[in-house]
Amino acid sequence: MQGKCWFLENKALKPFVCFYGGDQFLYIGDRIVSYFSTNDLYVALRGRIDKDLSLSRKVELYNGECVYLFCEHPAVGIVNTDFKLEIH
């Protein structure tokens, strides 16, 4: 299936891809792609680079949606760096 991801980083041999989705499905463009198991879930990048990126991390958000991170190597952690701390 061809589609566009939410985010693609393609810096010198360290590509990774992020998709939005939910429990057992991903949004690819305007399509919903469901899956049964995350064990064999991967993204095949074809074009300027030819790489298969496996699912490294699935992050569940507070609203029930998920962010899926695909990359070549395991992700140690994901940190939210866009927050504001207000002290009253």
Curated annotation (Swiss-Prot):
Domain of life: Viruses
InterPro entries reported for this sequence: a/bCoV_VIROPORIN_3A-like_CD, Coronavirus_Orf3a/b
Ranges where the CoV 3a-like viroporin CD domain occurs: 1-75
PROSITE patterns according to UniProt: COV_VIROPORIN_3A_CD
Stated family: Belongs to the coronaviruses NS4b protein family.
Stated name of the protein: Non-structural protein 4b
